[in-house]
Structures are given as structure tokens and as C-alpha cells.
A protein has these predicted regions:
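Membrane-interface amphipathic segments in extracytoplasmic regions
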Residues: 1-209
Length: 209
């Protein structure tokens, strides 16, 4: 979660929705932007506890992004496995990520494949069952703008226009993995499990498999 008091803007970073790119672009565009400290969840803190700790931020422009839940779950698992492979090959950055990320340290040894990650993970790991919409509301407030990862540049440009920044022409590409059709990695049971876990997101954002 990043905040700029100069621009009066708060960015809520939902995992695997393009947030690392937004973090980097905000840092390059706004001199005073910084991570909001002291919140559970760190970079991925939810709006509710942030506003409880800092009620003055209710007056800021608040935005975040969401993503198709099936695509998001596949991207999340693939990122963890990719980091594991890179660390084993001697990549120091990946090794550091693995060492400090509590969720990754729970996931990688316990879910040997994507199927177990989907079918068991949400039941056993709170972070994996939290609907995206729950990050973006709380304390009587909702995000002013919710963009979609599927329409990333166009939606992010709307944010830049809203907070008075010059759009650079296109977004940066940070932490992007190889593109793949997530559907081919799902069985019917896995598809239905994600639909059950993220029913609130499907209802709110009208995503389909």
C-alpha cells in the first residue's frame, strides 16, 4: 500500500493484479510517495485496517486493481514456483524473496502442484481465500476507482489523469511472467473451487472462467 500526501492518493495493492508495476511507476512519478508502514500485510495491507489506523486517509483518492480470479490463482502459483526455480539456480533476488515471504514458505513445500494449491490452499491459507473486494473497502469507505488487470494501461491512465500526472504512453513491465492460457491448467473441480472461494469477486466484477 502506497500513499502520497502531496497528491492525496492511496494505492491498495491486491496481489497479482499488476501492483508491482504501479508501485514502481508511482515512485518514479511522485517524489513523496512511500509505503504506508505498520500495517499487517505490508505492501498488501487491506483498506479497512489502513483507514482505522489513519482515518485522515478517508479523504484521499483511493484506488486499486483486480483480476480474473482463475487467472490470478494460476499466476500466483506460477510466480512462486518460478522464484523457487530461480533461487535454486543461484538468483540472489529470488532467494531473498523466498526467505522473507511467509506465505511462499508455507505454500511451496505443502502444495506440490497447482491442483493441490487450488483445492486445498484456500482452506488452509487465509491469504489464498480472501476475496479481492475485501482489500478495497472498509471503515465505511470503498475505493474510488477499481481498475482491471485485463485493461491495465487504459485503466491506469485514468488514475494518472485523476491525480494530475502525465501518462508516459505505456506502463512499465515489472514481475511479469510468461503469458499462458490459465484455463488449460484447470479441471472442472478446480474451476468450481475458485468460483466458490471468490464468489464475492465474481458477483461484483462479473468475471467468467
Amino acid at each position: 500500500m502506497m500513499v502520497s500526501h502531496e497528491r492525496r492518493v492511496l494505492f491498495v495493492h491486491v496481489q497479482k493484479t499488476g501492483g508491482s508495476t504501479i508501485d514502481r511507476m508511482l515512485e518514479e512519478a511522485i517524489p513523496d510517495v512511500t509505503y504506508l508502514q505498520g500495517l499487517r500485510g505490508g505492501r498488501h495491507a487491506r483498506l479497512a485496517p489502513a483507514l482505522k489506523a489513519h482515518p485522515e486517509l478517508k479523504e484521499y483518492f483511493i484506488f486499486g486493481f483486480v483480476r480474473n480470479p482463475w487467472a490470478r490463482m494460476y499466476s500466483w502459483y506460477a510466480m512462486m514456483r518460478r522464484a523457487e526455480t530461480q533461487a535454486a539456480e543461484g538468483n540472489a533476488k529470488a532467494a531473498k524473496q523466498l526467505a522473507k515471504n511467509r506465505l511462499w514458505k508455507r505454500v511451496l513445500p505443502n502444495y506440490p502442484d497447482f491442483e493441490s494449491f487450488v483445492l486445498r490452499g484456500p482452506n488452509e491459507q487465509r491469504e489464498l481465500r480472501r476475496a479481492q473486494i475485501t482489500y478495497l473497502r472498509g471503515q465505511g469507505r470503498r475505493a474510488d476507482f477499481i481498475g482491471r488487470q485485463e485493461n491495465f494501461d487504459a485503466d491506469l491512465q485514468k488514475v494518472w489523469d485523476r491525480i494530475g500526472l502525465e501518462w508516459p504512453g505505456e506502463s512499465l513491465k515489472v514481475n511479469t511472467g510468461p503469458s499462458a492460457d490459465y484455463r488449460q491448467h484447470y479441471t472442472d473441480e478446480m474451476r468450481d473451487k475458485v468460483a466458490e472461494v471468490f464468489a464475492k469477486d465474481l458477483k461484483r466484477f462479473k468475471y467468467e472462467f
